[in-house]
Amino acid sequence: SWANLNTFGR
């Protein structure tokens, strides 16, 4: 999920 990528704070 894109939300998982959002965890990186990008």
UniProtKB/Swiss-Prot annotation:
Keyword Secreted applies: yes
Keywords associated with the record: Calcium, Hemagglutinin, Immunity, Innate immunity, Lectin, Mannose-binding, Secreted
Subcellular location: Secreted
Superkingdom, taxonomy of origin: Eukaryota
Any one cellular-component term (Gene Ontology): extracellular region
Chain coiled-coil ranges: none
One GO MF term attached to the UniProt entry: D-mannose binding
BP terms from Gene Ontology: innate immune response; positive regulation of erythrocyte aggregation
Keyword Calcium assigned: yes
Subunit structure: Forms an oligomeric complex with the C-type lectin 35 kDa subunit.
Functional description taken from the UniProt entry: Calcium-dependent lectin involved in innate immune defense. Binds mannose residues on the surface of the Gram-negative bacterium A.salmonicida. Shows agglutinating activity towards horse erythrocytes.
Designated name of the protein: C-type lectin 65 kDa subunit
